Regions:
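Extreme N-terminal starter segment of soluble prokaryotic enzymes
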Residues: 1-2
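Acetyl-CoA-dependent GNAT
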Residues: 5-79, 84-85, 97-99, 103, ...
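Ser/Thr-centric signal marking residues that sit
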Residues: 65, 116, 121
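Active-site acidic-Proline motif in GNAT/NAT acetyltransferases
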Residues: 84-86, 90, 118-119
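Residues forming the Rossmann-fold NAD(P)(H) cofactor-binding site
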Residues: 94
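Conserved GNAT acetyl-CoA-binding A-motif
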Residues: 104-116
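Single conserved hydrophobic/aromatic residue that forms the stacking wall/gate
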Residues: 120-130
Length: 130
């Protein structure tokens, strides 16, 4: 398994990864054209905004991703942290978060922020809580 910077040509695989992750959540979908057009040229988008976007690749398949962009004056914002469900619980997301923490320290950023939505719960979580 390899962690590397995303390339523009990775867009379709990243989109497919996110769609696979969303399958576990009710009423959750990815509308790339209206909500996430940056995924089509992911490398250029993040580079032009002074951020970075990484992907985990296993056997030529993207199985995880995450990016960051500067946010406000002294913060970094995490974007699109997704790990394929078959690769979870291996510390992959933790490694990405440690990378972001290191970058934040290097550039003397005060906070790392992440926006998420609490409307979506997985069927598995619903079953555990019933």
């Amino acid at each position: 398994m390899q962690l590397r910077l995303a390339r523009n040509k990775d867009g379709n695989q990243i989109i497919n990864l996110i769609k696979r992750c969303f399958k576990d959540y009710k009423n959750c979908y990815l509308d790339v054209d209206n909500d996430s057009p940056e995924l089509r040229d992911v490398y250029s988008y993040f580079k032009n905004k002074k951020g970075k976007f990484w992907v985990y690749v296993d056997k030529n398949k993207i199985i995880g991703c995450m990016g960051y962009l500067p946010h406000e004056k002294n913060n970094l914002e995490i974007h699109k942290l997704y790990i394929d469900k078959n690769y979870r619980m291996r510390g992959l997301a933790k490694k990405l978060m440690l990378r972001i923490e290191s970058i934040a320290k290097k550039y003397k950023k005060r906070k790392i922020v992440l926006w998420t939505c609490l409307l979506y719960t997985s069927d598995a979580a619903d079953e555990r809580n019933s």
